[in-house]
Curated annotation (Swiss-Prot):
Residues 722-859 are cytoplasmic. Gene3D superfamilies: Cadherins. This is Cadherin-related family member 1. Residues 1-19 form the signal peptide. Interacts with PROM1. The gene is CDHR1. It is linked to Cone-rod dystrophy 15: An autosomal recessive retinal dystrophy characterized by retinal pigment deposits visible on fundus examination, predominantly in the macular region, and initial loss of cone photoreceptors followed by rod degeneration. This leads to decreased visual acuity and sensitivity in the central visual field, followed by loss of peripheral vision. Severe loss of vision occurs earlier than in retinitis pigmentosa, due to cone photoreceptors degenerating at a higher rate than rod photoreceptors. The lineage of its organism: Eukaryota, Metazoa, Chordata, Craniata, Vertebrata. It comes from Homo sapiens (Human). Its main location: membrane. It is found in: Cell membrane. PANTHER family: CADHERIN 23, CADHERIN-23. Residues 775-791 have a biased composition (Low complexity).
Length: 859
């Protein structure tokens, strides 16, 4: 323990010796204006931005030890600067304001770790022009008498600027250059300019804007000038310098015949021109009175002293004098004004309307509507009168009510006139619009102040005439009824209205047009219904249209059109062409059965097909929409068919049902016998194949045959025409053609189809070419005209003899048509046809006959 104490004591003595041997650091003193050193006599502008590097502390240590810098401030002041301890850079951290603090005391220190050297420095804050002038002792108000002499001092303003130098100097000037006032630019004294005057009556208050401006200076590196403004209010004080003034001139008064003595006629008003301090005013009449009028000296009211009937003149020119009385009671300023008083007759009679029996304020008249334009309402006997005289008896007349219907004559009346009312708009006088027209006849005086007026009611009762046509509420009426509606059924009700009254407003209805035969209309109600015997059929005629006429008793009418549509009812079942039909089916090709529903619209005429019974039941399928029947997919040969139904000779019977889609639905059945063969059998005969292809369209076969015949005819015509032109150009005389007459009864020429033969008991229909007789030299009235004539022979070749003229050749025409052969036993064909061919021909005949019947029904 004792050894440790001795070691610590030795270490302390060693440190003391070393400290006495180490010299303290010191600052460099670089003089005034230097930005580094010990901040001696350092100054800084007050507009220096915060964060600026303003100075660098600089010093050294004799031993070369590292040194550090510090700056501190009195606790009662702001810490304006901060220092980098290593490099000595001093930064401004607070804004400077010279007006608040013009110098800053700080303690700077330098240390080498063992020795610390501190110095007290004073930093001067230099001025910048950052303050604006400021007026003191505001607001500024001055009271100035209006008679103050020009150049007199009115007021003094004072402004201070806390800046120093030019930035703290203040000069004054006025913002309004045309002001009657002026200001001394250095002292701020306000004066009334030379030659200027103040007038209380013209302007009681003046507002002077004074601007204080400093001398300018630098701020943040730029030259700036600050200014301030203030307003000086100068109130002008009134003085007695104005004469009295009359208000409301000129003055006119009127005295009427019933004015009583002592009545006030008019009142004059005057006031002191000096309104700030007005004097008392007295009124008096100077001349022109003649004792007829007097005036109240304090109020200025002029009154009449005599009865108007005693006055000698119609117009009096009075002169009223007003006098100011000073506060001492002595007369001061005076003024005079003329007053004109006119004695006039009393307008005491308003205009009055008179009828045949005296004064009347209501006039009535009955008249027909739509009178001629310009017609005078002679039933009105109206007189208007004003008993006053002269201008008092002049008044205007006008009609008050619906405008533009009537006009009144005369429009301006003097004393008395007969009133005439004339029709101006005949169309507006309509009984249907208004049964009663009411007007007011107004008479108003024109040139009188009273504007007396009077009114009289004019009531016009309109009488109806037949001036309207019955009018339907619609131009078209559309109705729909079912086709099975019984006779007498209601269809639609039409309505027409005639605005006229009485018998003229009664409407009677009737119908006309091609479609009106099946319908009737009630003449009074307009209800359209079917004839009791009418039977409607949508399949025959689905739509009707006709016209309805609405007519009044004088024959004025209007027309509307009616459209009636029959709604289809399912009243026709589907119908097959025959109840028993025969078809030939080639393997792989369907046959078709068809039923027709004569209903007019869908779905009543849409037919669905089904097989109700078949023997056997597993052989055929049918398309329910088209009626096509085909073998089931599993049957592809006659052998397969024989395996299913052994013992049958490829002839099957089906019961096919055709059912429409109406409600309720109808159906029909037909027995279909189908003979099935294969394509190999048909391939042996091209014509049979062709007939198989056209079995559902017999017109195709007819078309092919007709085309063949047309080709033959065309070739014949071409050959005849060529021969004719050759003979004509050869200039040869040919013998005249003979006239061919018909033979008594030649056998008809037919083209027989030898390879068609029917195995059934019914004979197949044959087609033959029927030639029409030539247009010339034929006896068309012959009973044998149905027989085909022989074709004329071609002309002989031309001879070599010269021709004296062109021979007129007549080329006969040949026409052909397909007609069925007469019902006589057909000759035996040279060859026998197959059963399929016979069946196809039978089916082709049936369809051809059905198509012919359909076409005849259509045409």
């Amino acid at each position: 323990m004792r050894r440790c104490r001795w070691a610590a004591l030795a270490l302390g003595l060693l440190r003391l010796c070393l400290a006495q041997a180490n010299f303290a650091p010191h600052f460099f003193d670089n003089g005034v204006g230097s930005t580094n050193g010990n901040m001696a006599l350092f100054s800084l502008p007050e507009d220096t931005p915060v964060g600026s590097h303003v100075y660098t502390l600089n010093g050294t240590d004799p031993e070369g030890d590292p040194i550090s810098y510090h700056i501190s401030f009195d606790p009662s002041t702001r810490s304006v600067f901060s220092v980098d301890p290593t490099f000595g850079n001093i930064t401004l951290v607070e804004e400077l304001d010279r007006e608040r603090e013009d110098e800053i005391e700080a303690i700077i220190s330098i240390s080498d770790g063992l020795n610390l050297v501190a110095e007290k420095v004073v930093i001067l804050v230099t001025d910048a022009n950052d303050e604006a002038p400021r007026f003191i002792q505001e607001p500024y108000v001055a009271l100035v008498p209006e008679d103050i002499p020009a150049g007199s001092i009115i007021f003094k303003v004072h402004a201070v600027d806390r800046d120093t130098g030019s930035g703290g100097s203040v000069t004054y000037f006025l913002q309004n250059l045309h002001s009657p006032f002026a200001v001394d630019r250095h002292s701020g004294v306000l004066r009334l300019q030379a030659g200027a005057t103040l007038d209380y009556e013209r302007s009681r208050t003046h507002y002077i804007t004074v601007v204080a401006k400093d001398g300018g200076g630098r701020l943040h590196g730029a030259d700036v000038v600050f200014s301030a403004t203030t307003t000086v209010t100068v109130n002008v004080e009134d003085v007695q310098d104005m004469a009295p003034v009359f208000v409301g001139t000129p003055y006119y008064g009127y005295v009427y015949e019933d004015t009583l003595p002592g009545s006030e006629v008019l009142k004059v008003v005057a006031m002191d021109g000096d309104r700030g301090k007005p004097n008392r005013i007295l009124y008096s009449l100077v001349n022109g009175n003649d004792g007829a009028f007097e005036i109240n000296e304090t109020s200025g009211a002029i009154s009449i002293t005599q009865s108007p009937a005693q006055l000698q003149r119609e117009v009096y020119e009075l002169h009223v004098q007003v006098t100011e009385m000073s506060p001492a009671g002595s007369p001061a300023a005076q003024a005079t004004v003329p007053v004109t008083i006119r004695i006039v007759d009393l307008n005491n009679h308003p205009p009055t309307f008179y009828g045949e029996s005296g004064p009347q304020n209501r006039f009535e008249l009955s008249m027909n509507e739509h009178p001629p334009q310009g017609e005078i309402l002679r039933g009105l006997k109206i007189t208007v009168n004003d008993s006053d005289q002269g201008a008092n008896a002049k008044f205007n007349l006008q009609l008050v009510g619906p405008r533009g219907i009537f006009r009144v004559v005369p429009q301006t009346v003097l004393n008395e006139a007969q009133v005439t009312i004339i029709v101006e708009n005949s169309a507006a006088i309509d009984f249907e619009k208004s049964k009663v027209l009411t007007f007011k006849l107004l008479a108003v005086e024109v040139n009188t102040p009273e504007k007396f007026s009077s009114t009289a009611d004019v009531v016009i009762q309109l009488l109806d005439t037949n001036d309207n046509v019955p009018k339907f509420d619609s131009l078209y009426y559309v109705a729909r009824i079912p086709e099975n509606a019984p006779g007498g059924s209601s269809v639609v009700a039409v309505t027409a209205v005639d605005p006229d009254t009485g018998p003229w407003g009664e409407v009677k209805y009737s119908t006309y047009g091609t479609g009106a035969d099946l319908f009737l209309i009630h003449p009074s109600t307009g209800l359209i219904y079917t004839q009791p015997w009418a039977s409607l059929d949508a399949e025959a005629t689905a739509r009707y249209n006709f016209y309805v006429k609405a007519e009044d008793m004088e024959g004025k009418y209007s027309v509307a059109e009616v459209f009636i549509t029959l709604l289809d009812v399912n009243d026709h079942p589907p119908q097959f062409g025959k109840s028993v039909q025969k078809k030939t089916m080639v393997l792989g090709t369907p046959v078709k059965i068809e039923a027709i529903d004569e209903d007019a619209e869908e779905p009543n005429n849409l037919v669905d097909y089904s097989i109700t019974h078949a023997e056997p039941a597993n052989v055929f399928d049918i398309n329910s929409h088209t009626g096509e029947i085909w073998l089931k997919n599993s049957i592809r040969s006659l052998d397969a068919l024989h395996n299913i139904t052994p013992g049958r000779d490829c002839l099957w019977s089906l019961e096919v049902q055709a059912k429409d889609r109406g409600s309720p639905s109808f159906s029909t059945t037909a027995l279909l016998k189908i003979d099935i063969t294969d394509a190999e059998t048909l391939s042996r005969s091209p014509m049979a194949a062709f007939l198989i292809q056209t079995k559902d369209n017999p017109m195709k076969a007819v078309g092919v045959l007709a085309g063949t015949m047309a080709t033959v005819v065309a070739i014949t015509v071409l050959i005849s025409t060529a021969t004719f032109w050759r003979n004509k150009k050869s200039n040869k005389v040919l013998p005249m053609r003979r006239v061919l007459r018909k033979r008594p009864s030649p056998a008809p020429r037919t083209i027989r189809i030898e390879w068609l033969k029917s195995k059934s008991t019914k004979a197949a229909t044959k087609f033959m070419l029927k030639e029409k007789p030539p247009n010339e030299n034929c006896n068309n009235n012959s009973p044998e005209s149905s027989l085909l004539p022989r074709a004329p022979a071609l002309p002989p070749p031309p001879s070599v003899a010269p021709s004296t003229g062109a021979a007129q050749w007549t080329v006969p025409t040949v026409s052909g048509s397909l007609t069925p052969q007469p019902t006589q036993p057909p000759p035996k064909p040279k060859t026998m046809g197959s059963p399929v061919q016979s069946t196809l021909i039978s089916e082709l005949k049936q369809k051809f006959e059905k198509k012919s019947v359909h076409n005849k029904a259509y045409f």
